[in-house]
Amino acid sequence: MDIVEEILKLKEERNAVILAHNYQLPEVQDIADFIGDSLELARKATKVDADVIVFAGVDFMAETAKILNPDKTVLLPSRRATCAMANMLKVEHIIEAKRKYPNAPVVLYVNSTAETKAYADVTVTSANAVKIVSKLDADVVIFGPDKNLAHYVAKMTGKKVIPVPPNGHCYVHQKFTIEDVERAKKLYPNAKLMVHPECIPEVQEKADIIVSTGGMIKNACLHDEWVVFTEREMVYRLKKLYPEKKFYPAREDAICIGMKAITLKHIYESLRDMKYKVEVPRDIAEKARRAIERMLEMS
């Protein structure tokens, strides 16, 4: 059985579209109809002309697609495709922060569960967080769940950003250290460093540019050699888009297990058996949709 051929056949039969995040396995990226970062995928989800969305990403991304497309079938090919950071933020953290800062808007990174998004005034991605927080008429904002992105937003906007929970982080980006920066500069003296804002502040300070994965794609044209401080598969995406340039992963072990839980076999089985259907309770979806749509309007 040629699995790629079978997927394409099923895709046509089901009137399905495959959306994939930049961190997906190369072979999954190759079969996707659209590849992007969280913001690009959220935007794309609102414009999809298909009955079925197969989401090659992690659970919160598939939830966002379902919230924006309540009448479409959204499939997450593997139940193991989950985000540890999104699960760090609980509703109780938000309620507690609101008690202390009753006038502060709640700004949630899209890397959060649908349940917590229902408590957000607006959601953000790493691509638009600074822009959106700058536009808010507030000097203090509650921000979760990534403390490193919260630090970056505070630095760029001059606002007081309260991280919830205090230690929320992405385990992949938390791995990058100053030693990785020094090694990269030694190994690739002509390269510049592109750093994701989920990295720790000390690494951010050494960056030539601090950008989302979508920003990495847009800015790669500025230089011929880059060391990439984000999930390893982003290097595959960049090399494919810019074959004439050189890209190096800052760490070979910067791997998101949740993203790698989806293989071609999972996508094939997902389309064959129409599994696993993503459902979001209506009351939660309606509240979360307001926060997501506000983000899309503001960015």
UniProtKB/Swiss-Prot annotation:
Keyword Transcription set for record: no
Keyword flag Plastid: no
Cofactor: record remark: Binds 1 [4Fe-4S] cluster per subunit.
Major localisation: cytoplasm
GO molecular function: 4 iron, 4 sulfur cluster binding; metal ion binding; quinolinate synthetase A activity
Catalytic activity: iminosuccinate + dihydroxyacetone phosphate = quinolinate + phosphate + 2 H2O + H(+)
Pfam hit, one: NadA
Pathway connected to this protein: Cofactor biosynthesis; NAD(+) biosynthesis; quinolinate from iminoaspartate: step 1/1
Residues binding iminosuccinate, per UniProt: H21, S38, Y109, V110, N111, S126, H196, P197, E198, T213
GO cellular component: cytoplasm
UniProt-annotated binding residues for [4Fe-4S] cluster: C83, C170, C256
GO biological process: 'de novo' NAD biosynthetic process from L-aspartate
Cellular compartments annotated: Cytoplasm
InterPro entries documented for this protein: NadA, NadA_sf, Quinolinate_synth_type2
Keywords annotated in UniProt: 4Fe-4S, Cytoplasm, Iron, Iron-sulfur, Metal-binding, Pyridine nucleotide biosynthesis, Transferase
Cofactor: [4Fe-4S] cluster
EC number: 2.5.1.72
Primary enzyme class: transferase
Family stated for the protein in its record: Belongs to the quinolinate synthase family. Type 2 subfamily.
Role summary: Catalyzes the condensation of iminoaspartate with dihydroxyacetone phosphate to form quinolinate.
Protein name as it appears in the record: Quinolinate synthase
